[in-house]
Curated annotation (Swiss-Prot):
Ranges of the Cytoplasmic topological domain: 1-31
Compartment(s) of residence: Membrane; Vacuole lumen
Lineage: Eukaryota, Viridiplantae, Streptophyta, Embryophyta, Tracheophyta
Active site: D133
Residue span of region Disordered: 57-86
pH-activity dependence text: Optimum pH is 4.5.
Modification after translation: Glycosylated.
UniProt family annotation: Belongs to the glycosyl hydrolase 32 family.
Name the record gives this protein: Acid beta-fructofuranosidase 1, vacuolar
């Protein structure tokens, strides 16, 4: 193990006084126990680092400012103005790539070699062109199926079809021919997002959003042409499509993304569909016996004022106890129901936990202060339009979402591709906190590990960076655990609240974490770190953050600081997992 240390290179404009060791009177140390698993898929040098900042704060770093919509579960930088984001395809009311504006005068001299190493190895992406929402996931006859919004003609949004891929392990994927194309009047402007339902008799129902020749969003039905085909190569659209149209009072561009169906006590199937009334996000409930004719419930499943259009809704149960997933139709005292909506206004996936009342077909959140669009998120980075499915093969619920890059449209055209899917995650109820979900990469990803490098009892003093010699690798699965020295009776944690100040916002404990995608001079790097703060009640709050501001030297890439509060219970250590193929973080 290399025990040498070096100072954290200061941000441009940072006072060099604070880039090295703090005064001796302010020095503290903490212990980091790190286990780094390296899967070498192709050669590229990368240095693994652990970082801890001393308690000083540079004078040019502003403290975290919370706006009037701030909630303790999330933090965003003051420079982030999601309300001004303009996604591609906005006029058509669909989810598409959205980035805060980057000056047209900024550009970077990208090369093909640079673009090639940006292709991922852990994450699914097509061979070329544009991809967005995951659609209709299911397990059938030994194969996991992933459908996805796909433009076969270009690396930007448009001409949306359903791409199709299959896998036996959720990691290695086989590309298949396009499953459905925009070839009918009711989906002439796009075969948009939808969901699969496996029926007890073995039938498969696929409901999707069609955008008609007149730009009206409708729900359409399709089914496999040959159920004996495990690859489900061919799909047939129902001759009576569309099966649902926007109800009275709903705009024709605000009715989309039917969910997986579930059964009620009367034996009828239910689905929910996202919409809005003025600025109130809502989810309609429809009943059906044959998936061809429907009746709308008198009320709505749920509504939250001020959240705007709800799209890509997901609705499913999670067991209060145990480590297994729950089939979508289960509803009893042993489960809670998750309602998730992708907010079109902000391009954020929010979820909430609550109770589903079958008698009036409404869902009520456990905590109104953490309602859909207000509190919890699946993810605080680039993540949208997520979808779960129940994997009957391993009795688990699997979650997947869409990640779009923060570069420009011209970069996408130069690369020839855009967007990836997240690593599939299992979803469970956190019965320790009782207030949130636990997400974890599926176990199959561990099969990609080729070499293990183990570091333990690494002592890191305040204001230092410790280099860990992991050899040559480009794909890493990093597990790191930190143990902090206990506070002395006279000490308090005086860090700024949240993640907004970034990795140079220093407190008594923190930030501490790891640096990934770092060059030798530490001028280009991405800190993934914990930060501690005091609550108004005097308790210690833990935040898990990522600081992208020095993640790339390219000026035409949007960079931000993001993160959220994470529960760390008494007696637990600070644990993080980072998949360094795309850089995805999980903390607890």
């Amino acid at each position: 193990m290399d025990t040498s240390t070096s100072a954290y290179a200061p941000l441009p404009g940072e006072d060099p006084l604070f880039s090295g060791h703090p005064p001796a009177s302010l020095r503290r140390s903490w212990k980091g126990f790190a286990v780094i698993f390296a899967s070498v898929l192709f050669l590229l040098s990368l240095v693994g680092l652990i970082i801890h900042q001393g308690p000083q704060q540079p004078p040019d770093v502003m403290p975290d400012k919370q706006d009037e919509h701030h909630h303790p579960q999330s933090t965003t930088p003051a420079s982030e103005t999601t309300a001004s984001w303009e996604p591609r395809g906005k006029a058509l009311g669909v989810s598409a790539k959205s980035n805060p504006p980057v000056s047209d005068e900024l550009s970077y001299n990208w090369t093909n070699a640079m673009f090639s190493w940006q292709r991922t190895a852990f994450h699914f992406q097509p061979e070329r062109n544009w991809m967005n929402d995951p659609n209709g996931p299911l397990f059938y006859k030994g194969w996991y199926h992933l459908f996805y919004q796909y433009n076969p003609d270009s690396a930007i949004w448009g001409n949306i079809t359903w791409g199709h891929a299959v896998s036996t392990d959720l990691i290695h994927w086989l590309y298949l021919p396009i499953a459905m194309v925009a070839d009918q009047w009711y989906d002439a402007n796009g075969v948009w997002s939808g969901s699969a339902t496996l029926l007890p008799d073995g039938q498969i129902v696929m409901l999707y959003t069609g955008d008609t020749v007149d730009a009206v969003q409708v729900v359409c039905l399709a089914h496999p042409a040959n159920l004996s085909d495990p690859l489900l190569l061919d799909w047939v659209k129902y001759s009576g499509n569309p099966v649902l149209t926007p109800p009275p009072g709903i705009l024709t561009t605000d009715f989309r993304d039917p969910t997986t169906a579930w059964t009620g006590p009367d034996g009828k199937w239910r689905i929910t569909i996202g919409s809005k009334v003025n600025t109130t996000g809502i989810s309609f409930v429809y009943h059906t016996e044959d998936f061809k004719t429907y009746n709308m419930s008198k009320g709505v499943l749920h509504a939250v004022p001020g959240t705007g259009m709800w799209e890509c809704i997901d609705f499913y149960p999670v067991a209060i106890n145990g480590s297994k997933g729950v089939e979508t139709s289960v509803n009893n005292p042993s489960v809670k129901h998750v309602l998730k909506a992708s907010l079109d206004n902000t391009k954020v996936d929010h979820y909430a936990l609550g109770t589903y009342f079958e008698e009036n077909e409404t869902w009520v959140p456990d905590n109104p202060g953490l309602d859909v669009g207000i509190g919890l998120r699946y993810d605080y980075g680039r993540y949208y339009a997520s979808k779960t499915f129940y994997d009957q093969n391993k009795e688990r619920r699997i979650l997947r979402g869409w990640i779009n890059e923060t570069d420009t449209e011209s970069d996408d055209l130069a690369k020839g591709w855009a967007s990836v899917q997240t690593i599939p995650r299992t979803v469970l109820f956190d019965n320790k906190t009782g207030t949130n979900l636990i997400q974890w990469p599926v176990e199959e990803i561990e099969e990609l590990r080729l070499n293990n490098t183990d570091f333990s009892d690494v002592l890191v003093e305040a204001g230092t960076v410790v280099e860990l010699d992991i050899g040559t690798a480009t794909q890493l699965d990093i597990l790191v655990e930190f143990e902090l020295e206990p506070l002395e009776s006279s000490e308090t944690v005086n860090s700024s609240v949240g993640c907004g100040g970034g990795a140079v916002d220093r407190g008594t404990f923190g930030p501490f974490g790891i640096l990934v995608i770092a060059d030798e001079t530490l001028t280009e790097l991405t800190p993934i770190y914990f930060n501690l703060a005091n609550s108004t009640e005097g308790d210690v709050i833990t935040y898990f953050c990522a600081d992208e501001r020095r993640s790339s030297k390219a000026p035409d890439v949007f960079k931000q600081v993001y993160g959220s509060e994470v529960p760390v219970l008494d007696g637990e250590k600070h644990f993080a997992r980072v998949l360094r193929a795309l850089r995805k973080e999980v903390g607890r």
